[in-house]
């Protein structure tokens, strides 16, 4: 028998590879593990400590020089401390806001509209750590904020999460949401779900709401559906001619 790696002859009792290739593969695996561990250590080293971290000392908090306030919460939620340098390095919008003599830069207070305290806190924490605990609502809230403040890494992170939560039941509303916020990855995945389940979804209440509120989306959905039908028919015709 021949080795699947180097194509050299090997004894039949060996499982698919010769001894040399097996040893080499094991060494490569160990090397990759070491590289992964090294990368993890570097990420941990480069991860910025946030004033929102549990156990952060009051000393480190004293070095913050800006606070963010969620204006949606009228119950007097506490301001969220941060560092201008971090906000500026993570967001072009914050950079323009804080490097010029705008009100936020002078006052040291940034009011964020249409966002809950929890969403804003998670957003700021992500800017420091590239970590966020998501559910579907939080992912939507953070995607909106990441688009507004041009935090591309966070937007991609939220999009990937939302795609994993897609189903025929939520595909229509997710499609409308993704369209509104330019979330192309989610948009394409939701459209695929809709097209695959078109016969069921056209009878749903969400579909009728979409017809009334945003008929252009319905046009796009039907264009995608008809395109799929044409491609399917063309594929069937080609197969029958070949046979």
UniProtKB/Swiss-Prot annotation:
GO molecular function per UniProt: ubiquitin protein ligase binding
Coiled-coil segments: 19-51
One GO process term, biological-process aspect: protein ubiquitination
Transmembrane annotation, as ranges: none
Pathway, per record: Protein modification; protein ubiquitination
PROSITE patterns cross-referenced by the UniProt entry: BTB (PS50097)
SMART domains in the cross-refs: BTB
Pfam family membership, one: BTB
One GO location term (cellular component): cytoplasm
UniProt key word Coiled coil: yes
Domain called BTB: residue spans: 64-136
SUPFAM superfamilies linked to this entry: POZ domain
Cited InterPro entries: BTB/POZ_dom, SKP1/BTB/POZ_sf
Domain notes: The BTB/POZ domain mediates the interaction with some component of ubiquitin ligase complexes.
Subunit relationships: Interacts with CUL3A and CUL3B.
Function: May act as a substrate-specific adapter of an E3 ubiquitin-protein ligase complex (CUL3-RBX1-BTB) which mediates the ubiquitination and subsequent proteasomal degradation of target proteins.
Name this polypeptide is given: BTB/POZ domain-containing protein At4g08455
Organism: Arabidopsis thaliana
């Amino acid at each position: 028998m021949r080795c699947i790696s180097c194509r050299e002859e090997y004894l039949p009792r060996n499982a698919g590879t010769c001894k040399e290739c097996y040893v080499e593969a094991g060494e490569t695996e160990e090397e990759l593990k070491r590289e992964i561990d090294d990368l993890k250590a570097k990420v941990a080293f480069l991860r910025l400590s946030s004033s929102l971290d549990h156990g952060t000392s009051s000393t480190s908090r004293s070095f913050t020089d800006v606070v963010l306030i969620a204006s949606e919460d009228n119950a007097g939620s506490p301001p969220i401390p941060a560092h201008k340098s971090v906000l500026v390095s993570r967001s072009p919008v914050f950079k323009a806001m804080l490097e010029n003599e705008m009100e936020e830069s002078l006052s040291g207070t940034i009011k964020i509209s249409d966002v809950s305290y929890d969403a804003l806190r998670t957003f700021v924490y992500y800017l420091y750590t590239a970590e966020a605990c998501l559910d579907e609502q939080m992912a939507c809230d953070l995607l909106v904020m990441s688009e507004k403040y041009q935090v591309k890494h966070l937007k991609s992170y939220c999009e990937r999460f939302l795609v994993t939560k897609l189903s025929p039941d939520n595909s229509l509303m997710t499609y409308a949401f993704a369209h509104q916020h330019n979330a192309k990855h989610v948009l394409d995945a939701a459209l695929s779900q809709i097209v695959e389940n078109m016969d069921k979804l056209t009878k749903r209440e969400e579909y009728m709401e979409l017809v009334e509120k945003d008929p252009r989306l319905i046009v796009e959905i039907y264009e995608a559906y008809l395109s799929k039908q044409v491609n399917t028919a063309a594929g069937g015709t080609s197969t029958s001619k070949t046979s």
